[in-house]
Amino acid sequence: MYNKNVAITGSTIEKTTKYDQFREDKIRMELYRIILPLYNEGYRTFTCNPHSYIGLLGADTIIMLREADKCPDITLSAIIPGTTFPADTDKVYRALYDDLMKQADNKEMLPEKEIFSNVLTGSHIVCYYDDFSEEIGQVRASGIPYTNIRKMI
């Protein structure tokens, strides 16, 4: 009952928020509202792609819930692509990424092309994709329950 897992992934920051702080706050609130009930339903391992913006915010939310003792035995698993962040990545997000990688319970490097297929092995998917994107089409076709945060904000 307590070994179910959730994959959190989605678009880049440019496609997600365009660096809009208000939109980022709304995404964080939705992640909190989604992750806490999933944890209470028995999901314990949350796998994030921190190179996707939603994965980075999801990882941060997971750590916050763990530190607040709301989800004491939640596990953060980070899937890291072989590519590095672009040189122009915002320094705040880069620092957040570095901090979260130190706190991740598990880390696995995968080639960029394998990351999305790894997402499709979860018991639930939390994502941020445009309704007409190829990725959301694959999520729908997988039959795995999913929550697309883009529809909530």
Regions of interest found by a model, annotated:
Residues 1-153:
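Acidic/glycine-enriched connector segments
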